[in-house]
Amino acid sequence: MSWLNNPSQNFVDPFIRIKCILGDDIRIIKFNSNISYGGLMNQLEQDFQCPISIHQYEDYEGDKVTVKSKDDIMEALTMYFELKALNPTKIISTKFFLKQLPPQSQPLSSSLSPTQSLILNNNNNNNNNNNNNNNNNNNNNNNNIIQHTDFPSLIINEHEELISNHNIKWQKGQILGRGGYGSVYLGLNKDTGELFAVKQLEIVDINSDPKLKNMILSFSKEIEVMRSLRHDNIVRYLGTSLDQSFLSVFLEYIPGGSISSLLGKFGAFSENVIKVYTKQILQGLSFLHANSIIHRDIKGANILIDTKGIVKLSDFGCSKSFSGIVSQFKSMQGTPYWMAPEVIKQTGHGRSSDIWSLGCVIVEMATAQPPWSNITELAAVMYHIASSNSIPNIPSHMSQEAFDFLNLCFKRDPKERPDANQLLKHPFIMNLDDNIQLPTISPTTTLSTNTTNTTATTTTTNNATNSNINQQQQQQQQQPPTRTQRVSISAGSSNNKRYTPPISTSTSSSSSSILNNFSINIILPINLIILIFREIKPNFVNTLSRVCKHWKQIIDDDELWNKYCSDRLINKSKFEESITWKSNYIKIYKQQKVWFHNKLNHSTLKGHDKGVFCVKLIDDQGMVLSGGEDKKLKVWDISGNHHHNHHSGIVGSISKKSGLNIINNNNSNNSNSSSNSSSSNSRYLFSLKGHSGCIKSVDYQRQSGSDVSRVFTASADFTCKIFSLKTKKTLFTYTNHQEAVTCINYLGDVENKCITSSLDKTIQLWDAETGSCLSTLRGHTGGIYCVKTDQVATHGNGYNHLVVSASVDKTSNVWDTRSSSKVRSFTQHTEDVLCCYVFDQKVVTGSCDGTIKLWDIGTGKTISTFIPSETRQKNYVWTVQFDQSKIISSGKTGIIRIWDIYNERDSRSIGGHHETIFSLQFNNQKLITGSLDKLVKIWSID
């Protein structure tokens, strides 16, 4: 987070946030303090994708001021930044009221054309860019690349290989892993047959994406550290290249995986294996320390093992070069479970911090658990390491030599810890069994400059990629029960949540009880308090407030909660603006806890003859609608009160058919635990018939009261139908589509319209009373699987005229139904986009590429990418829904996944269906699913 970048000073936000209003299109845009008028207009036109002018602005007193010249606008900006200078911690915001200009018109005279590249770097970066342009003025292509990517000058200026035009002859193989901004592939050198790993990072505008900027800066740091390192126990870098589409990083391919992944496969290691690996880790650390480099993130996930048992240190994104006195480094880098006390307390650290982390890795290898695994709260772990005099538990089964070795590594005073060379002479390392031979290491080879056309352009490559490859491989092979996070104060945070070593919950201690055992008068560094605050949970607040005198003020500071929530992309609902940010987060956390941990009961509705393609839950009415391949829409009563006529005559006319009322109730905490029993809490009511093809989608309309009056269906027979639930007859058939209709949405009684998507590549808006087509949206080049409206707008102030579609053409489009025009296109999926869902100006899409992407309507930028573990089998994501606390998805595997939307992880997996799930919907504390296995399941939370 930017507010943690300088822990010794108060947070100073260099931006102001301006609410820009163009008709019904409202966006909050951040502007840098040194932006010019031309840059301002350029940024506005790029965001709104049309020529505009600023008509009015709102001053600090809330009055609207009419703009007469560009000087008025710049004077307003100056005023806002002066206000911010007076109160640096206050978030200053205002409003710009915009007007759209005709295409040939231009806003008030601008110094920049809309097509020029706008670079908003600080003065140092600007100077660096100028120097770089002077050095490369003979290469126009290179300059174009720099303007196109706007990468940090650290990469462009210090690593000239990034703008080389040499071709790299390699063939892309199987995908090894995916991340939010790129994919990792196995590569084959087409000339030599050499295998290597390649991470391709798609080029986007990093100025608007701080997460990507941190990733690229981490890459640059690794390249800088590793460009001259060559050692048998350090991952070998092959090179880096940059073109106009991708940043490609080439590195040694390690097929064995990391220590953490091996622990997940084989369990704890024997002491002999630990000795073999520890000796090689020490050899790598000795080389690094001799070359004035501290790794700062030694842990099992960053130590790779090849097929011959050779250890390779990887992931140098947290590393630091030093010279002379090394205690000057006071920033917090690494993963807390493996951190030395001086790192967490930020009292200065050096090579000895790597030695402490090595001891933690030995404990990890001996137990298959991270150190401090008996403490469940990450914040409590950090406090425990910093404030107590204890050391990690040493496994009792280890030898006396191992005990002595670990006690040396775990000296609380870093000055008392031996260095790597001294530990290599310790009996624990020297006294290997006579019949044990260390792995034979072949000589290290380097790339010669005359082979740059066939391999990589230089010998510098990004090591973070190698760690990402192996961590993403581990993610497919193990179940992570807790969260491991890399944290950084001095240079922003860089999160790594992909691997969490298994821990035993039976030995877990209460974080509150651990903290309460410590003195409450200890005063911790304010930077540590802020860092712990980032990991805080609401049920932990009261305990932390007793830790030291700073906490009461911090916990009640809603501005800090605002920054905390903003960093996690947590928003407040516009209908609940009066609640505090603290209350907002606690509310979301409670919602997550219910879905992530509470017991699940489920019932099974049997009666469909073929697969179920659509379901709809009407929870307050105790009703379920389901349709599918058998061409019938079935209506179910799940209220359990079958004698109370609350469905306006529907229950009174039940068609009692045998074989349609088979209900199984199961209790489930996870995908593996369930028990079966029979019940009659739910039953089939009747079917709505009339379609000649399978029913693909269903929606409904309520009467003026609360009962459901009309049902809307979309079918593969090219038609849509409106049914009356009271008479069970067709009221109207819509026939304007030319191919199968895939999705239907009723837009509410105010609009009284329906919007439908079809494989005929169109979206149609039509009147639900007359059936007349009001507008047709065209722009997709393939069939459309899904169309959705913003559920916050639909359930709040009404339909907001924006819809989102998912198509066979691999894109998801945002449409304005008033102008029948495409507003934005999301193109980050690599295969068909099968489903989408819209909530509070954000969209979740699921694809045949096996990924789920959360993205923002206003910018079209990816916020997060969620990757089910079965992605390697290319299992399609057919259905997805989300709200402010979670994402729920499913698809080809029949497994339902509940995702933590803010930590990008799978928090719960539910089994129950044996084939593809095509539809799901959740509402309050119920979830309903429909599957190709002919079953409809209803999941309810205790």
UniProtKB/Swiss-Prot annotation:
Q: Which residues cross the membrane?
A: 513-533
A cellular component term, taken from the record's GO annotations: cytoplasm
PROSITE patterns per record = FBOX, PB1, PROTEIN_KINASE_ATP, PROTEIN_KINASE_DOM, PROTEIN_KINASE_ST, WD_REPEATS_1, WD_REPEATS_2, WD_REPEATS_REGION
Q: Report keywords, A-Z.
A: ATP-binding, Kinase, Magnesium, Membrane, Metal-binding, Nucleotide-binding, Repeat, Serine/threonine-protein kinase, Sporulation, Transferase, Transmembrane, Transmembrane helix, Ubl conjugation, WD repeat
Q: Which family does it belong to?
A: Belongs to the protein kinase superfamily. STE Ser/Thr protein kinase family. MAP kinase kinase kinase subfamily.
The WD repeat units are at: 607-646, 690-733, 736-778, 780-825, 828-865, 872-909, 912-942
Needed co-factor(s): Mg(2+)
The protein's name is Mitogen-activated protein kinase kinase kinase A
| Subunit details | Interacts with ubcB and ubpB.
Where in or outside the cell?
Membrane
What residues bind ATP, as annotated? Answer: L176, G177, R178, G179, G180, Y181, G182, S183, V184, K199
Q: What molecular function does GO assign, one term?
A: protein serine kinase activity
Q: Which residues form the Protein kinase domain?
A: 170-429
Reactions accelerated catalytically:
L-seryl-[protein] + ATP = O-phospho-L-seryl-[protein] + ADP + H(+); L-threonyl-[protein] + ATP = O-phospho-L-threonyl-[protein] + ADP + H(+)
Q: Where is the PB1 domain?
A: 15-96
Protein EC:
2.7.11.25
> By which gene is this protein encoded?
mkkA
The lineage's top-level taxon is Eukaryota
